[in-house]
Amino acid sequence: LIKLTPYAAKGGCACKIGPHILDAVLKSVQFPTNDHVLTAMGGAEDAGVYVLNEEVGLVQTVDFFTPVVDDPYTFGRIAAANSLSDVYAMGGRPLTALNIVGFPVPLVEAGALTDVLKGAMATLEEAGVVVLGGHSIENETPIFGLAVTGQVQPNKVWRNRGAQVGDALVLTKALGTGIMSTALKGDLFSEGTEAAVASMSMLNKMACEAAKNFTVHACTDITGFSLMGHGSEMASGSDVSLEIETAALPLFPHVVEAAEMGLVPAATYGNRKAITAVSGLVELESVWSDICFDPQTSGGLLLAVPLSETEELVKSLHQAGVHAAKQIGKVVARGDFDVYVR
């Protein structure tokens, strides 16, 4: 039986380079651009959009990471769902994908890469996405992901800026994948880890399609930089603040217990160090800081929508099979911090 996680020191989106380090690098590089570029490197948008004409914009994104689970097939499913997520976060429809592979040759020979690809293809078929090719290298640590191209109508792009005072904040997936992935390595809290694996394997397609029937002022997906990191980007980009209610957060079973046991990935501490425009967590139990800064892999969409539409949106999400969707807070006038946690 092949187990992938022993080959990776950090798994899933927890293996990202820290936001403060990456930001310093990106600020020192001048990236080519032109008038067709609607979104790109600036503004912390989830994907780039290149406008072809008034009706069609190309959405492009790339995502790859190290194993977050032991089973190769499941890893492929999770990696594919995660790679497609940024297109859904822009309100787009993914069309094509290219495989990105780095794998130890012994694992390839043992059939692990075959199973990873089979899992990814199952998810891509579910999404209606075709694969046009890919690239592979030999690597000591297994990595897999996809470069994805999609399309969106340029005047209907969802951005992570645009949240308005009075909007409700709706989150479509439960939090705690980093904590539960750490618990998984110790064979602990099987109910919670199974729920987390199912959530990570689930496409954000249904959430995106349901939300398109409502007024979306801003959207982002919650991944490696945590609810606080991605929430902070939405707040600062929109010149507002977010109020998050811990009692309203959707959580996987046993996440609180696992965090209390110290089953917290190292990237949580990196997020906490880098993301400082947050208020209120010091007054709460430390477990809430661990959850709010937990790096998510293939996390849900965070949507800022008019309060008047929120109840119907959540109902529509539930009917679409997005059962974890909840209102977790609201958008308020700009204060001293990006995010206030209650």
Task: Tell where the protein language model's regions lie, with residue ranges.
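N-terminal glycine-rich phosphate/pyrophosphate-binding loops that anchor nucleotide-derived ligands
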Residues: 1-89, 164-170, 174, 317, ...
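Glycine-/charge-enriched secondary-structure boundary and capping motifs
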Residues: 1-10, 21-24, 105-130, 139-142, ...
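Buried hydrophobic positions in well-ordered alpha/beta secondary-structure cores of metabolic enzymes
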Residues: 13, 49, 83, 91, ...
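A generic local secondary-structure boundary/capping motif
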Residues: 37-39, 47-50, 85-88, 121, ...
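Glycine-rich anion-binding loops of enzyme active sites
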Residues: 52-69, 74, 93-189, 329-330
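Small-aliphatic-rich amphipathic alpha-helix that forms the alpha element of a beta-alpha
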Residues: 72-98, 115-126, 203-215, 225-234, ...
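Short pre-catalytic strand/loop immediately N-terminal to key active-site residues, enriched for Gly-Thr
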Residues: 73, 191-199, 217-218, 288-293
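Active-site glycine-rich loop that binds ribose-phosphate moieties when present
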Residues: 147-157, 191-212, 284-285
